[in-house]
Amino acid sequence: MITDDQIPRAAADERRTAQAFQEKLRDRYDVAQMIMFGSRARGDHGPDSDLDLAVVLHGRRGDFIDTKLDMAGIAFDVMMETGVLVQPFPLWDGDLAHPELFTNSALIRKIAEEGIRLG
């Protein structure tokens, strides 16, 4: 995984949107880190592409669906402010180290290997 200071620019829109999203998450979640992945991380996104963010949370694993739906509501508020839609993907401490525990283990591996750690 690389960090956002190792790339020419994790464009201003992505940084601003991710920061706004993280600020809104603080009231409800203990965020360990956020990782940008997908087309915006690869740099092959279009103007209407969403911003895929893996949100790694501290603590005991919660319910994925409930957490994702709650985060999607927060993401909608951020989209109204920034014009960029965030697609949150909640993970918990240790999940990236054990992709084999997931039905979509290839996605977890991609996030761990190719994602851009923000902040």
Residue spans for each PLM region:
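Short beta-strand->loop micro-motif that forms the acidic, two-metal-ion catalytic signature
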Residues: 51-56
